[in-house]
Amino acid sequence: AIMSYEVGKRALDFLVENSGTRHNLEVDFFGGEPSLNFGTVEKLVEYARSQEEPHNKKFRYTVTTNGVLLTDEMIDFINKEMYNVVLSIDGRKEVNDRMRVRVDGTGSYDRIIPNFKRLVDKRPKNKDWYVRGTYTKYNLDFSNDVMHLYDLGFDQISVEPVMADPSEPYAITEADLPRIFKEYEILSEKIQKIRDEGKFINF
């Protein structure tokens, strides 16, 4: 079910009422997919802003999105209001589209890359963002996914292991750990090479 404005408003009220003397409050909008309910996100941000002065609070927002439904209007709102943005993509096209399948059976890669590039290109330099991927047993060579994202122009990158029931074919098991440790060594060498060339990458 999609969260209603009323439920979100009660959550914000609860946060304010139980935050004591804390001035800075963090609110994260994430999955499901916030862009499916973006009007509610906009209204909740507006409501939270109205509560800042009366309660001596300051809200900071983060949104996590898979990027499929992002419009220019959403991007402008996100870049204005969201302190941090997490852009979900798993790396190379074949890796991303194996796990992120749309209703019509196609993958999301070709749709989200242009959306993410527009968002990042328009994002103010003083606001945070990063692309965030998940690696599975299917792509234990995930250093290649990190480099693929970097080559696309994304220099703020996080890639983390999937959490899944061991019975799932894509689940990571203890037997995979030596391979994963080796891959992190490979990744660290690739990142160091970029930095040695005087370029920026944050992982």
Describe the predicted segments one by one:
Residues 1-76, 80-81:
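Conserved alpha-helical substructure of the radical SAM core
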Residues 8, 67, 109-112, 139:
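A conditional alpha-helix N-cap/helix-loop micro-motif detector
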Residues 31-36, 67-72, 84-106, 136-137, ...:
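Conserved radical SAM core fold
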Residues 79-85, 153-156:
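Glycine-enriched alpha-helix->loop->beta-strand junction motifs that scaffold or abut catalytic
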